[in-house]
């Protein structure tokens, strides 16, 4: 009889299937033989009943009219998720949760009460800098009313996180730096023997079937993929950089949905730089991953100047097609570039460093063919078929 693997992801949407919270349930089913399920409110109403062996359990969000003015309203909205968990906890062998958080605590608490022998796996989706900042707030003495209330809020969150840790059987961290820092304790709670370094990966079951273009076949394309215009993705830095560069025979493709706040910025940018309209192309969101992979396959260079990332899955996908990656110094930058061996790490928000590196690419100062070969060799470390075996070894 197959074991059941359930991932709770309240706002899961179709495009997330290619991300870690979609890939892990898929590969747990395809490679390890689990009966995988994802429990969600299907907020965008875009999910099938089944995808690659993963069953989507879609429940209605309760009290949707409530705003999140208090923490209890968030819990109230999850009523139907809690209801499903209460009814089915005994039949769930492995419960996968995202983030060490107060919300994860309540899922874990209910699950362990009803199925004490069940296995809880928390994928941290972890940003070390954010954790250190939050923990400093919790640990320090407030110097103002504002700091007092902020500490009170963070302390309430961390009190539940501390109670979550003992219930958890396994916590994985995406970057080696985060893993080394967190492997023995979380907020002072012992985690020895229950942590794992597990980077995010790429869907090699699909990508390995695609003929990757040779370095010579690729086009002079610089690519970025993500939620364009959000504060995290720092798209404005990329555009401000590009207007300072002679792109020559290169083009830049920006793939992804555009944040509403960024639309006017984009329009003004092209009004002020009309010569770049044919050089810088916004494609819009591409939900069909096979279509998205065509862009990776055409491109030589992938750039992601984010202000923060827990990992940056799109960079690993780009590497699977031999792209030279230029990334800001976010959490997993060293893991992805093999400590700058196959890619370039620039300072966050540094237009000067980004200009310099892109100019080196365009002037052929960087041997992209050599980087291409090294990248394709290194990226095998991020195949999900390999990563899932590593995870499976730790789940009893």
Label for each model-derived stretch:
Residues 293-299:
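Short alpha-helical donor nucleotide-sugar binding micro-motif in glycosyltransferases
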Residues 324-327:
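Short hydrophobic beta-strand element within catalytic cores of glycosyltransferases
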Residues 266-286:
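Nucleotide-activated donor-binding/catalytic signature segment of Leloir-type glycosyltransferases, i.e.
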Residues 110-114, 140-171:
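Membrane-proximal helix-turn-helix segments that form the acceptor-binding/catalytic region
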